[in-house]
Amino acid sequence: TVFALINLSPDEYGNPEHIAQALSKYHQVESIDICTGDWEIVAKIKTKDQESYYEFVKTVLPRRGIIKIKSLTSLKQVKSEFIVW
């Protein structure tokens, strides 16, 4: 599992849903969130291996409106729970 932290260009900053919707169409994207702080979008991406993630980064993530990507690789998931309020 990789968490991709995404910065948007100034022309997309006011409408992050546009990029989020475009990325959400890929089967590798498990979840996508619009955030506050230093990164506008956080995408949870699952691929079968590191090479597949590399191809995803090379082909999908370089798109108009995205100016910076930082990848955080999960080494071990300690807890995952679905909570309904």
How would you describe each model-predicted region?
Residues 1-85:
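A compositional/biophysical signature of low hydrophobicity enriched in polar/charged and small residues
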